[in-house]
Amino acid sequence: MSLTSDIKQELAQVHVAKNSVRAAEVSAILRFAGEMQAVGGKLVIEANLDSMQVGMRLQEFIQGLYNSRVDVHTVNPTVSRKTPRYLVRIIDNADEIARRTGLVTRSGHVVKGLAPSVVSGTISDAEAAWRGAFLANGSLSDPGRSSSLEVLCPGQESALALVGCARRIGIAAKTKDSRGFDRVNVRDAEAIGALLTRMGAQKTRMLWEEKRIKRESRTPANRLANFDDANLRRSARAAVAAAARVERAMKILGDDVPEHLAEAGQLRVQHRQASLEELGRLADPQMTKDAVAGRIRRLLTMADKRAEDLKIPDTNSVVTEDLLEEI
């Protein structure tokens, strides 16, 4: 399986609780993979995707948000195309969905960029826009001199809007016109890694980073990359252990968790292998890594004290060898 397939499989399983964030992802998928056409005097919206999982996710989100029927059809391979495609078709209430997702304005004019609600939305909305755009038409090449994370765009306006979303989450992305198509790409290795985490593909990021480090270690000038690989695994294990402890802490404390500590804890649980610095960037508003570490430390201390009082297993009880061997 390619890195691109790995990412899409992982992103298709990202849990999204807020409806506004779900709507931002839907809007981006429909913008970057969708097409509107009139059939028999009625508007039909279709999204052409390369993953059944993505198609099912889009179907679930649209039906949940807009209470409209959505069909997913498999388009069999052809002589020129050896893999199947998946067509998500929206007929029921398509006019209303087009307006609510920002594909058209209230007066019915086509929006060429991203929906205003996404462009001016929250950090989570910007992350969802990138997740949706990548699920629709994104790719990631193997690490190397020309490695890049790229999204094929329907036009210059949508490309510029995606660059703007990247800027809002601290990622440097650029537009380019290649073979008559507008594209947005990220070439810096650190930026690619950070963007994968932002979108929710932390496991694939670890795989990509491991491939990058192994490639670099093949050259004499980069022999120390092996140490980086070991450090990366140690950091990942520590992060996973912390996430498990935080989950246990939340169970111990229940509703007594202070809101600011709960927010830091949720970040740790949702992004299990991210560094403290990355968690700080994921926070809204953003925090320093020391602030994140301090809040998580206070949460664990508070839970361990409660566990001691109640004479129940503390947060360290969940950190087992089996847990760490998975990394």
UniProtKB/Swiss-Prot annotation:
For this protein, the record's InterPro entries field holds: Homing_endonucl (IPR027434), Sporu_reg_WhiA_N_dom (IPR018478), Sporulation_regulator_WhiA (IPR003802), Sporulation_regulator_WhiA_C (IPR023054), WhiA_LAGLIDADG_dom (IPR039518)
One biological process term from GO is: cell division
Q: What is this protein called?
A: Probable cell division protein WhiA
Asked whether the UniProt record includes DNA-binding among its keywords, one would answer yes
GO function terms (MF aspect):
DNA binding
Q: Which organism is it from?
A: Corynebacterium glutamicum (strain ATCC 13032 / DSM 20300 / JCM 1318 / BCRC 11384 / CCUG 27702 / LMG 3730 / NBRC 12168 / NCIMB 10025 / NRRL B-2784 / 534)
Q: Which family does it belong to?
A: Belongs to the WhiA family.
- Job of this protein: Involved in cell division and chromosome segregation.
Q: Could you tell me which residues form the DNA-binding region?
A: 275-308
Where is coiled-coil annotated?
Answer: none
